[in-house]
Amino acid sequence: YVLISGNHRLNSFKLLKRSNIPAVVHEEDNALVHQLIELEENLSKNSLTVLEEGDHIVLREKILIELGQKSVAGSNNYTKKAMSNATLSEQLKMNKRTYQYKKQVSKINEATKKLIADTKTADNLNDLITLSRQPENVQIEVGKILHNKQARTFKRALLMAKTKFINSTWTKENEE
């Protein structure tokens, strides 16, 4: 058997030295379905940061597309029962706009995500949306600044990063 969800419950029962644990056993042997169930459970908890939530939402959509459960732009949505973004956002109990913003967060450069994962910015939707709209070099620089605690706020880190690249561009133009 493979444990897909309920790890905290399993550990609690082990600590209590109980030999029987109530469980739901699925006969499904599809790894994608297992991954989808795990993602659903993680998204239903409130322990994820906004940064993690965005990645989970995008991965969930990719799996649903592979399983033929999500509608894709350009396909005929009337011939099959595929879910739309509106339906997916309702399932997660969020409005469509918030859902779209959280998906946008996943566009942040992977190296930057790792750098900011343990900062306050990782849980601030507005800051993450702003960061996702920046060029990759600015994103990475903001990540380094926040990770190294060279700035206390996201806005300050963004200003420092943009200034660095404006200064380097200005210097190159003057050398010519």
Language model segments and positions:
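Amphipathic, charge-rich alpha-helical segments that serve as recognition/docking helices
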Residues: R9-S106, I129-R133
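Short, conserved phosphate/pyrophosphate- and ester-handling motifs at nucleotide-, phospho-/glycolipid
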Residues: G6
